[in-house]
């Protein structure tokens, strides 16, 4: 899973303008030959249980990102769809929603 994390971290700061959160996750996993749905609801429904390790997908209601294993998430967060790294706790606070859990594919 560290290869997935490395691929996600390499995209931090990119102003892609093309990926929402689930599309970003799907793209990163696809770089490693792993198919992931392009919908946060489908990621939650179809993934296996994870534990927040590096490369796991952290899921909120309507949002997903890739865990770094240290309490942070790499994700596409805002209207500009920039790739950024934030603490999972801050994302939960900003969005006023709790983490549903973690998924692996």
Q: What is each stretch, according to the model?
A:
Residues 5, 9, 22-26, 52:
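Extracytoplasmic/secreted envelope proteins and their assembly/folding machinery
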């Amino acid at each position: 899973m560290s290869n997935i994390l490395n691929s996600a971290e390499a995209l931090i700061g990119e102003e892609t303008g093309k990926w929402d959160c689930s599309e970003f996750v799907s793209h990163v996993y696809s770089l490693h030959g792993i198919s992931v749905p392009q919908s946060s609801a489908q990621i939650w429904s179809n993934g296996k249980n994870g534990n927040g390790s590096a490369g796991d997908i952290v899921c909120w209601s309507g949002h997903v990102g890739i865990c770094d294993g240290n309490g942070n998430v790499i994700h596409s967060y805002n209207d500009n769809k920039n790739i950024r790294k934030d603490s999972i706790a801050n994302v939960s606070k900003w969005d006023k929603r709790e983490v549903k859990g973690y998924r692996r594919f």
